[in-house]
UniProtKB/Swiss-Prot annotation:
PANTHER family (alphabetical): PROTEIN FAM222A, PROTEIN FAM222A-RELATED
UniProt organism field: Mus musculus
Coiled-coil stretches: none
Taxonomic superkingdom: Eukaryota
Protein name: Protein FAM222A
Lineage of the species this protein comes from: Eukaryota, Metazoa, Chordata, Craniata, Vertebrata
Length: 453
């Protein structure tokens, strides 16, 4: 059918090309051959042209007008006779469909900086259509090398938190600092703390007390019954004591005491003191003088003592300075209604080791101390052992008692770094017990940190 149509269409052209029969037949044949030569190049011709142009990508071939070169609209038009000009037949994205062409043209799409003279390289890429396309340096680098940019290789480097500064070597091995961290909110995470770990403190205490050549003075005075230095000024009888507080506290608790055991071995590291501390003592400079209004409900407080007892009513905190045996702030609620009991919140005895006159670590000087808190109310506290390494027969029991007393005094010190009544006035609703994981095989400490609610 097509052949018939072609035959019917061709003779008028031949007749127009040869209008007069007087012309030579050869001229008519040449005209007819030139008409048939306007065709698409064969695949063999395209391959030969591609091989010839591959060595010189920037060469320009000017074809005669009677030879039609396939353009972009003619490429990839049909596959096995089916029209694939639509986008749904193309396996490539829309922006890459226009860059499919002959092999020679695809190879010509390289950076012209490779053939440019030595000097400043040009980041110019010639596309299939012959247009110059400027590329970004990252694209040029990725295009030249098949590897990604070196800055993207390797794992991401996250900023490391600042490491805790090492305590000075002149201080004793066990150094503690304030663990009272006011939180801005319940849901916010804690900032990275530079405080020494409780594990490292206990480990150093254990190593210092269990060393075969350890000095007796290193472990003897871990807890000595003595009035607090917060009331009596610097104590000259404790040369190792780096925590001598002489600053005046607010009127609610002028004579706020430390525990019954002032701890010469537990020192306050200078690197971890708050901004309000001075070298001569504790200066509470940054704390507000006017407390916020107290909450109407009764206050739940947690005591740091190791024996159960009934707390005093909040009315005894009316500005009188008296000495108390433990660092618990449960009797400093300024004008809170009613009395409350804290017996169910008392922690278990430290390691459940009780110092009795029949034990190996008994010291008559560290007998039970009875301290008068108010008329008619007395609290009996078992004093921690004072001289625990003199004349030992069973060393393991004594080391256990030393660690127990040191942990107890450590908790007292943490509770008494800030005035308790200021803590309750600032924080309002009490304390939250934070259970530290099991420190040693025979220890389990509960450090109480005040938090906002």
């Amino acid at each position: 059918m097509l052949a018939c149509l072609q035959r019917t269409q061709n003779p008028p052209g031949q007749h127009l090309a040869c209008p007069s029969k007087s012309l030579d037949l050869r001229k008519c044949e040449s005209v007819a051959s030139s008409m048939h030569s306007s065709r698409y190049p064969s695949p063999a011709e395209l391959d030969a042209y591609a091989e010839k142009v591959a060595n010189s990508p920037l060469s320009i071939k000017i074809f005669p007008t009677n030879i039609r070169v396939p353009q972009h609209k003619h490429l990839s038009r049909t596959v096995n006779g089916y029209d694939t000009s639509g986008q749904r037949y193309s396996p490539y994205p829309q922006h890459t469909a226009g860059y499919q062409g002959l092999l020679a043209i695809v190879k010509a799409a390289v950076s012209s900086s490779a053939h440019a003279p030595a000097g400043h390289p040009k980041s110019v890429l010639k596309s299939v259509e012959g247009k110059r396309t400027k590329l970004s340096p990252a694209t040029v680098q990725v295009g030249i090398a098949p590897y990604p940019v070196p800055s993207t290789l390797g794992p991401l480097a996250y900023p490391k938190p600042p490491e805790a500064p090492a305590p000075p070597p002149s201080l004793p091995a066990a150094a503690t600092a304030t663990s009272v961290i006011p939180l801005p909110g319940r849901g916010l995470p804690l900032p990275p703390s530079n405080l020494p770990s409780i594990h490292s403190i206990l480990y150093q205490l254990n190593q210092q007390c269990q060393a075969p050549g350890a000095a007796p003075s290193a472990c003897q005075g871990v807890a000595v019954p003595h009035p607090s230095p917060a009331k009596h000024g610097p104590v000259p009888s404790f040369p190792n004591l780096a925590y001598s507080a002489t600053a005046g506290l607010p009127d609610c608790r002028k004579g706020t005491e430390l525990s019954q055991g002032a701890t010469p071995a537990l020192t306050l590291a200078g690197a971890t003191k708050p901004a309000g501390y001075a070298e001569g003592g504790l200066d509470y400079l940054l704390w507000p003088q006017k407390p916020p209004p107290p909450p109407p409900q009764p206050l739940r407080a947690y005591s740091s003592s190791t024996v159960a007892g009934k707390s005093q009513s909040p009315e005894i905190c009316g500005g009188r300075a008296f000495e108390r045996a433990n660092g618990s702030p449960h009797n400093c609620g300024m004008g809170l209604p009613g009395s409350f009991t804290v017996g169910q919140y008392f922690a278990a005895p430290w390691n459940s080791v009780l110092v009795t006159p029949t034990s190996d670590c008994y010291n008559p000087a560290a007998a039970a101390v009875v301290t008068e808190l108010a008329p008619g109310a007395a609290r009996e506290l078992a004093g921690p052992p004072g001289d625990v390494l003199s004349g030992l027969t069973s060393k393991s029991v004594c080391n256990t008692a030393v660690l127990s007393s040191s942990l107890q005094s450590l908790e007292y010190l943490i509770n008494d770094i800030r005035p308790p009544c200021i803590k309750e006035q600032m924080l309002g609703k009490g304390y939250e017990t934070v259970a530290v994981p099991r420190l040693l095989d025979h220890q389990h400490a509960h450090i109480r940190l005040p938090v906002y609610r």
